[in-house]
Amino acid sequence: MNDKLCWPDGRRIAVMLSFDFQGGEDVRPDRNGKINHEEWTQAEYGPQTGIWRILRILEETGVNATFLTCGGIAERYPEQVKAIVQNGHEVAGHGYHHEVARDLTLEQEREVIEKTTAMIEKRAGKRPIGWRSCTQSPNSLELLMEHGYLWNSNSFSFDLPFLWEHKDSTLVELPRQPFGDGRAYGHHDSGNPNDALVIWKGLFDDFYEESRLGPAFCPFQFHPFISSRPGRARALKEIIQYMRKHDGVWFARGSEVAELTLKLGANFPRKPALKEAVAS
C-alpha cells in the first residue's frame, strides 16, 4: 500500500465506475460480407436502450462514472453523449469503431485517436483526456502523450495508479481488474447476475479491508449493452448500493483520480513508456 497517498477528505478508497460505451462496431461481417443481425441488435441495445437505464441507476444511487466512448457512438448517438455530460459524468475515448489497437499501424492508430478526439469534443462540448482502447499497441502510450491525453486505462499490472514517462511527457495509468461484466457474463447471453454480484463484492471487500493500511483504488469495468439488461441492471445497482453503505468511499471519475495522481506524482511508481517495455 502507499501510505503517502491521500484521497480527498481523507476517504480511504477510490471507486472508479467505468462503462465502455460501444455498439455494433464489434460485429464484423462474415466471409460473405454479411452482418449477423442478432449480434448487431444485441450490441446496439447499449446506445439505443440500455444507456438510459444506466444513467437512471447512477442518478438514483448518486454516484459519478466515466464513459469510455467510441467516436462512432458519439457520431451516431449525440443525444446519449449529451445526456452523459449533463448528468455530470466523464466522457473519454474508446477508439472510433472499437478498433483492435494491436492490429493497427502507427499511422492508423494516430488517425483513430485524432478522429475519436475530434468527434467526442464535438458531441460532448469538451475534449476527452482519458482513453481505453480495445487492446493496446506498442505505439499507444506515445501517441496518447503526443495528443495531450492525461490518462490511459489498459494495464492490469498494478492495483494503484502509476505514471508512464517518455521524454518530457507523463501519462497516468489507471489500472483495471479482470472482473468486469464482459467476463462475468460472456459479453452476451451467459452468466448469472448473482454470481457477478458475489465477484464484485469480493473485489470491493478485499480492497476495502486493505484500505485500513493506506488508500486503495477499486476500478470496475462495465458495458451498457451488457449490464443494462433487466436482471443484470439490478446487480449493477446492488453493487453500487452495497459500496455506498461503507464509510470513506469516493466514487471518482477517471480524470479526478488521474489529476490527483499527477499532483502527488512523487508517491507513485514511474515506468518508461518505451515500445520495448510495453511490448514485453
Show the residue positions of the predicted features.
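Positively charged, amphipathic and often flexible ligand-engagement surfaces
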Residues: 161, 173-195
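Catalytic alpha-helical scaffold of carbohydrate-active enzymes acting on polysaccharides/glycoconjugates
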Residues: 1-174, 197-220, 226-280
